[in-house]
Amino acid sequence: MTAADKHLYDTDLLDVLSQRVMVGDGAMGTQLQAADLTLDDFRGLEGCNEILNETRPDVLETIHRNYFEAGADAVETNTFGCNLSNLGDYDIADRIRDLSQKGTAIARRVADELGSPDRKRYVLGSMGPGTKLPTLGHTEYAVIRDAYTEAALGMLDGGADAILVETCQDLLQLKAAVLGSRRAMTRAGRHIPVFAHVTVETTGTMLLGSEIGAALTAVEPLGVDMIGLNCATGPAEMSEHLRHLSRHARIPVSVMPNAGLPVLGAKGAEYPLLPDELAEALAGFIAEFGLSLVGGCCGTTPAHIREVAAAVANIKRPERQVSYEPSVSSLYTAIPFAQDASVLVIGERTNANGSKGFREAMIAEDYQKCLDIAKDQTRDGAHLLDLCVDYVGRDGVADMKALASRLATSSTLPIMLDSTETAVLQAGLEHLGGRCAINSVNYEDGDGPESRFAKTMALVAEHGAAVVALTIDEEGQARTAQKKVEIAERLINDITGNWGVDESSILIDTLTFTIATGQEESRRDGIETIEAIRELKKRHPDVQTTLGLSNISFGLNPAARQVLNSVFLHECQEAGLDSAIVHASKILPMNRIPEEQRNVALDLVYDRRREDYDPLQELMRLFEGVSAASSKEDRLAELAGLPLFERLAQRIVDGERNGLDADLDEAMTQKPPLQIINEHLLAGMKTVGELFGSGQMQLPFVLQSAEVMKAAVAYLEPHMERSDDDSGKGRIVLATVKGDVHDIGKNLVDIILSNNGYEVVNIGIKQPIATILEVAEDKSADVVGMSGLLVKSTVVMKENLEEMNTRGVAEKFPVLLGGAALTRSYVENDLAEIYQGEVHYARDAFEGLKLMDTIMSAKRGEAPDENSPEAIKAREKEAERKARHQRSKRIAAQRKAAEEPVEVPERSDVAADIEVPAPPFWGSRIVKGLAVADYTGLLDERALFLGQWGLRGQRGGEGPSYEDLVETEGRPRLRYWLDRLSTDGILAHAAVVYGYFPAVSEGNDIVVLTEPKPDAPVRYRFHFPRQQRGRFLCIADFIRSRELAAERGEVDVLPFQLVTMGQPIADFANELFASNAYRDYLEVHGIGVQLTEALAEYWHRRIREELKFSGDRAMAAEDPEAKEDYFKLGYRGARFAFGYGACPDLEDRAKMMALLEPERIGVTLSEELQLHPEQSTDAFVLHHPEAKYFNV
């Protein structure tokens, strides 16, 4: 039912909801269990609560009365199990309508008895999920929809004021219940509101994996009148999901939580939340999220509802600021139509008409291959999948059922159902719980009741789908911009006015035709399409625009098509195109297209002919003879043409594994395996190192080469003779030092050295020097390598070198040191002076390889040529470095001697008397079930692609630029990993613990108080150093002093936060490393690091949103608009972490842990004060406007 039709409702319930907060009832089952019912009461159907509507109406009347008398405005009927599966288990499925009517009539009688003109009482028909999930194939959609129709008819017969579809675990089941209820109302001629409550588990998603955003996107277009949450958890676990609904739902929002998470007690599962605790939580939700209805679920009683009713009686519900985001959704996630810096890409390869591979797989019923094609499009960067099964001679309905049912659970991408047959579209809609798009409608046979337009729109309206509308009318396809816009206007007015669909749910396809025929009438087709898009977006900015893009280039060869498609897409996007049906990986960035090709393609699009110049002929000439094969196929052909041993080395360089085994078999007929490795495979790895060193190869491709090297050696190993000393070129023991859990750098060294002929003994993280030396002695190591990321680790390395001196092993073991906190100067000057043996700094894995080669050459007595240009240059560089170091030391000593004593003030010039914002609560809270899309919006792509993945690009030269790599490698791989990690549930473990604590400053200390009073006792004291020059800053200066707090009667607020991605993402990365999937390992580890940072940034923003100044002005009001400015501290205040810069004392982290208790989200603190899991980070937040990073 559309918003315009809701005046037809036979109740004033929605009016009341709009005026005040309503209170629902609590649990029914809990009360029934306390009623001492006998098996006779159930007529032998033990557990069938619905039969009590007939046998014990008195018990149910009492329960309803108790809730009403406790203050409830509405009660739910005892009809939760009046559905096909529940009653079917008792062989009474034929009584769905009857028992629904009886249960509703009981509640109606009590409501009428206790209601009055001043305060009406309402009845909500409870509609539960049943025990069978249609998305998993347990039951047919149409069967349960019709059963829900029967249940709804009974509720209408009994006098319900609304239907509450609750405890929904499957979006397809929810859709069946809502649409079944609407069908019942049409049959009965009586219309009432429908509310929907989904159940989000402790995992942060619904039972089948649906995020709250996917649920809202799927449910709201069905025409429900209110959406909310119930069951599964207590209020604490619901806050993030309610926040999403509050911000994005255009309809009222409600909640009915359990009385906490159940705990096992003497009487079985017990719910721990007391009535006053539930009331406090729900009152907070109303104030924060603007809820319209609150109540309780499992474990809640009339006592709970009495406290809730009292707590919310006088609360003024705030006006919600809704940010609506037009979207479609899969079962799992929502995809907005508006994409940042991109059109919405609709993958075209799951189309039986457009993809030969997909068609052949569908005809052969090779559904796994069909799913693989769908997943490939996900990897290539598609946002939606266009699913078309129409093919001559096939049963389209059967094919659609087979594929839609599989894609429902196998694809994280929403589906665009593409068919000319309404029966085929309906089959798809009845297997997909997410919000689909329908492709398409037009006026080819008019708009009468029997037209295909009307039949398809009936499906669109009922299922709440988005719809593609083609600019075709009874006269045919529109060719001019004027005609395209004219038909589009007619479509928009018809679809919105007669079918109740939002403009934002309409995708107008202004059609494009090939401009490659040379025919005069087609020359302007590209221009007309572009201008139609521009005019349409000008008139209707909320309407989406789309195109079947590749039509523009039909008739050209594939290479020319790719260029013309890419250029045309760019021009359409500039005109306002929102989406395109296209093969995403076949689109080139404009800067990747050679200038001549780009200009000719633009001339063709805009019909820039001259007497002596035809851009169509010129484009065809440019691509004449150009192979239609992909660049990879060309490269494989080149590879196959090389001599065998050159080919093996080149396979390593290219990272090309296909055909490797056959080449190795052939090679072993000519040379022994060890010779193949040493002479040819290692030559390939040497080339890889040179390419990396010169900036011509990126780290991900280096790791791809290492994977092929590892595979080649593994294939050759069974054919090699084992010797007692199997150390290859040399042996190194690698370890991350004691107290440090970071191992990515160490593992990259492992990969490069082990694939260049060295034996690597990698003993892991947090290794004390005793263990490192024990392994080095046991394994007869040639070299010891130590790694660490933390500043503290540099101190540990120094201590380790001193210990090696003491043990007398310095001359025996040369040492390689690496890590983010180390510098070359520190190692080669300070540490080299301490260590009695060789110690070297390795900036990266390839410098480590070069150092190993040098050390092992010297050990073998292979002295380098002292007079070679390289040796002379190295000596000059070393002499220059030492002279520079000595000069720096001399200058520093002179400056220190010349310094005059400075009087350090007690406090800096930081403003002391600033307004203190009010926190939403005191103490700490935990947050789980975070929507991935919420915090990935603050993921720093540059830090990920450049810093973590090493996509550096070329500045000039022939190689791809950084910007090219971002488009071709970075973003597609990021989308792929986010999709996979989300689908596999790895990102479901992200969690936050944060809190607000009363604080004051005392000199250089921040004191956290036991309560928000200026004279309150000290809970924890944090001491900070003060700058000895400059502004003399100290962290404590940014917190109100105790003296000023006493004078103002108000303390300051100090927020703390700790975020974690959980252990599974680290476990997954380690599995990839162990399985030699080196590139994947690098990428997953990098994503884990940057997602942790993104979550920290996101939660810092949440804290700024929650801290309120006078006039209810949030601290976040000063936030920047551009994402990049977040990474430059463009907001008010800053967050600081112990162990760095201005707060170097890592011991203070233990106090923060005591305040936050992060064990509740699975984070612990090691003896070395490191957080576990590794992908966790903590901070305290300063709200002071002058608070920015500084060093002491």
UniProtKB/Swiss-Prot annotation:
Q: Which residues form a coiled coil?
A: none
Residues in B12-binding N-terminal domain copies: 635-728
Q: What class of enzyme is it?
A: transferase
Which GO molecular function entries does the Swiss-Prot or TrEMBL record give? cobalamin binding; methionine synthase activity; zinc ion binding
UniProt record, GO biological process = homocysteine metabolic process; methionine biosynthetic process; methylation; tetrahydrofolate metabolic process
User: Which positions does UniProt annotate for methylcob(III)alamin binding?
Assistant: 739-743, 787, 845
All copies of the B12-binding domain together span 729-866
Question: Which of this chain's residues are annotated to bind Zn(2+)?
Answer: 231, 297-298
Q: Which UniProt keywords apply?
A: Amino-acid biosynthesis, Cobalamin, Cobalt, Metal-binding, Methionine biosynthesis, Methyltransferase, Repeat, S-adenosyl-L-methionine, Transferase, Zinc
- Catalytic function, reaction form: (6S)-5-methyl-5,6,7,8-tetrahydrofolate + L-homocysteine = (6S)-5,6,7,8-tetrahydrofolate + L-methionine
In what ranges is there compositional bias, type Basic residues?
A: 882-893
The entry's protein name is: Methionine synthase
Tell me the classification of the organism that encodes this protein.
Answer: Bacteria, Bacillati, Actinomycetota, Actinomycetes, Mycobacteriales
Encoding gene (name): metH
